[in-house]
């Protein structure tokens, strides 16, 4: 199954690259093809920045290129960040070429309430593992999960599988099992929904989901695709 998934991903990536090239970088007519240089914007640092109320945001940096030319000074940065109010704020970095092509990137700054499970969590590789059948396969260090507030008392989880496919297999975020949770006063976690964008399927269930706000830890067992993922993680 893993080989089948990998092959499908490689095929769709090749198709997507072709489409981007045709749509985003070429200006074709019946008699000729004029190649137009593409602009790109890249971010330094993390995509998500977690700050306490009243904290100071230090811009990690960004860069933009038009082909091989540096056009960072042409980037327009738009932000409505308010560190004095809890919430999630987007910072948009955008550049527009003379041909009218637009490239942009976004960073999200979360002003986190310390009484909520919001933050960037790193998987405890020594105590996290996947069980397919009778085998037990441990996680590798460095996998992370982002938990963000939805603003209605529920939370968005970037990957219930703790980065198993996103980081471990290198398949990217489209193969993360993202979804939403509710956390009870006693710390018990309820999985409200889940979905893998690439495979278009969901988890069967969550077992023993627990959040310890004081300790900054989350743990759960996820049953997905006839496998069990035991994930323990600690807030950064």
PLM regions and their residue ranges:
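Solvent-exposed, low-complexity, repeat-rich "mucin-like" stalks and linkers
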Residues: 37-69, 161
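Serine/threonine-rich, repeat-prone extracellular segments and beta-strand-based repeat modules
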Residues: 68-103, 107, 112
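Generic detection of short hydrophobic beta-strand segments and adjacent strand-loop junctions
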Residues: 49-51, 107-109, 179, 231-233
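Low-complexity "stalk/linker" and mucin-like segments enriched in Ser/Thr/Pro/Ala/Gly
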Residues: 65-72, 191, 201
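Residue-level recognition of well-ordered beta-strand positions that form the cores
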Residues: 63-65, 94, 108-110, 122, ...
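Extracellular interdomain linker/stem segments of modular secreted and single-pass surface proteins
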Residues: 36-38, 110-118
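Ser/Thr/Gly/Pro-rich, low-complexity flexible regions
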Residues: 115-236
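Bacterial Sec-dependent N-terminal signal peptides
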Residues: 1-7, 17-46
């Amino acid at each position: 199954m893993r080989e089948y998934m990998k092959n499908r991903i490689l095929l769709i990536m090749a198709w997507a690259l072709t489409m981007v090239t045709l749509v985003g970088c070429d200006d074709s007519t019946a008699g000729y093809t004029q190649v137009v240089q593409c602009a790109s914007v890249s971010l330094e640092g993390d995509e998500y920045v977690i700050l306490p109320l009243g904290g100071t945001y230090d811009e990690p940096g960004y860069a933009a290129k038009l082909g091989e030319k540096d056009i960072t000074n042409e980037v327009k940065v738009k932000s409505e960040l308010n560190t004095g109010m809890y919430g999630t704020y987007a910072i948009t970095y955008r550049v527009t070429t003379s041909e009218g092509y637009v490239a942009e990137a976004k960073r999200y700054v979360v002003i986190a309430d310390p009484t909520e499970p919001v933050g960037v969590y790193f998987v405890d590789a020594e105590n996290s593992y996947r069980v397919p059948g009778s085998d037990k396969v441990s996680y590798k260090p460095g996998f992370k999960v982002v938990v963000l507030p939805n603003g209605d008392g529920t939370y968005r989880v970037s990957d219930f599988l703790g980065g198993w496919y996103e980081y471990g297999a290198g398949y990217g975020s489209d193969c993360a099992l993202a979804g939403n949770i509710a956390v009870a006063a006693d710390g018990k976690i309820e999985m409200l929904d889940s979905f893998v964008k690439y495979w278009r399927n969901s988890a069967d269930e969550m077992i023993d989901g627990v959040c310890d706000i004081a300790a900054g830890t989350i743990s759960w067992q996820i049953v997905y695709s006839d496998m069990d993922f035991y994930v323990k993680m600690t807030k950064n």
